[in-house]
Structures are given as structure tokens and as C-alpha cells.
């Protein structure tokens, strides 16, 4: 499900049984990220899918990238793998920052 920054933030903050995935590259992640995010590079496909296999599919997953495109694709893969509650930050990290929300780094 695609959510705008405000809705994604509010839903994520109220969801205590969730995980946040940053699917950007390590270099992008090192420049700044959303608090609590785990970096899993979407472009490293073998490790991406391997990492997903270690996540409880019952947990809600909040996924973002730079602009929302990679994270959308990641969400589609996750749904195909059986994840039920997957939320894409449609404006990505750029939209998050533009809205003035807190980041690390």
C-alpha cells in the first residue's frame, strides 16, 4: 500500500509490531536515514531476498527508498513472498526530508 509521508509516519509510529526497511544503497543510507530503519540494499538482490527470509511475515513492514520507486518494487516482491502488511513511503526519503521529519545522520 502506498502512503504519503504523513500517513506513513503516523501509521508506523502507532504500529508497535513493525519493522522499517531502507532499501537504498549503503552509501545512500550512510548519508541519512529514518530512525529505526534497517538497510537492505534492493539492488543486491541475493542478499535482499535472503534478508527478507529472516523477517516475520506477520509483522507490518514500512519500506522506503530515495523517491518511492525501489521501495514500491520491494513491496511487490515482499507481497509475492507472503508479507501481508507492507507500506511504501510513496515520496521516499526525499519527501520525508522535505516534510521536515526527523532523520539520523
What are these regions (language model features)?
Residues 1-19, 26-60, 66-105:
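Rhodanese-like catalytic fold shared by cysteine-dependent sulfurtransferases
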